[in-house]
């Protein structure tokens, strides 16, 4: 069984080196090219899908659309869930990463970005950036909407969705593609591969490059490779 993971193509805020999180930004032109290239490589590799999953953020949705279009699979059913969203960067969202490092120190910013269990500064309740002000989250219990997340909290929302919704599709023999985000995919990869809390700090997933897993019957990886050529 094969599972394909794709981090969205470069976004406008990736290009500007800004913390993005749940802020909804579009793909950059380079990101569009990355997504289209991913779709072409998937087609060349002969990978076919029966069902697709993505977040509710534009950059991931558009990446998936380009992938399916370029691989001639636009008809594949797509399921969107906030549980596949990027990690919520709290009050860091919208700030420049380099300027934040100069203000707080590179070590502190590295912990906010890469540590498994260090939370970023949280959004204030009345901050206009709160996700509760966004219509796509209005049906969620307000207690489920974060004001900031670390990777641990991100994993705690991603993995139940994997277990309850995605994994059963794979076990039924359906071929799955997931287009999501750097940290929601890091959380899933950590779970699939059994990566330790310390080792996960060093894992980087490139934008717009399909990551193919070959899974056994227990959905444990027996092989993985990037479609980067």
From Swiss-Prot:
EC id: 5.4.2.11
Keyword Isomerase: yes
Pathways involved: Carbohydrate degradation; glycolysis; pyruvate from D-glyceraldehyde 3-phosphate: step 3/5
InterPro entries: His_Pase_superF_clade-1, His_PPase_superfam, PG/BPGM_mutase_AS, Phosphogly_mut1
UniProt-annotated catalytic positions: 8 (tele-phosphohistidine intermediate), 86 (proton donor/acceptor)
Reactions that this protein is recorded to catalyse: (2R)-2-phosphoglycerate = (2R)-3-phosphoglycerate
BP terms from Gene Ontology: gluconeogenesis; glycolytic process
Biological function: Catalyzes the interconversion of 2-phosphoglycerate and 3-phosphoglycerate.
Protein's name in the database: 2,3-bisphosphoglycerate-dependent phosphoglycerate mutase
């Amino acid at each position: 069984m094969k599972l394909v993971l794709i981090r969205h193509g470069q976004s406008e805020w990736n290009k500007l080196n800004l913390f993005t999180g749940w802020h909804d930004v579009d793909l950059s032109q380079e990101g569009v090219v990355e997504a289209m290239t991913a779709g072409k490589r998937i087609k060349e590799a002969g990978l076919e899908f029966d069902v697709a999953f993505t977040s509710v953020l534009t950059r991931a949705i558009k990446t998936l659309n380009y992938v399916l279009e370029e691989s001639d699979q636009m008809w594949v059913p797509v399921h969107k869930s906030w549980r596949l969203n990027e990690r919520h960067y709290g009050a860091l969202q919208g700030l420049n990463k380099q300027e934040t490092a100069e203000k707080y120190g590179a070590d502190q910013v590295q912990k906010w970005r890469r540590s498994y269990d260090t939370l970023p500064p949280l959004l204030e309740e009345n901050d206009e950036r709160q996700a509760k002000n966004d219509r796509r989250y209005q049906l969620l219990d307000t207690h489920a909407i974060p004001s900031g997340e670390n990777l641990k909290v991100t994993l705690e929302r991603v993995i139940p969705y994997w277990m309850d919704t995605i994994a059963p599709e794979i076990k039924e023999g359906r071929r799955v593609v997931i287009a999501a985000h750097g940290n929601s995919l890091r959380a899933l990869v950590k779970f699939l591969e059994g990566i330790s809390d310390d080792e996960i700090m060093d894992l980087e997933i490139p934008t717009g490059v399909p990551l193919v897993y070959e899974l056994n019957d227990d959905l444990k990886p027996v092989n993985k490779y990037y479609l980067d050529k």
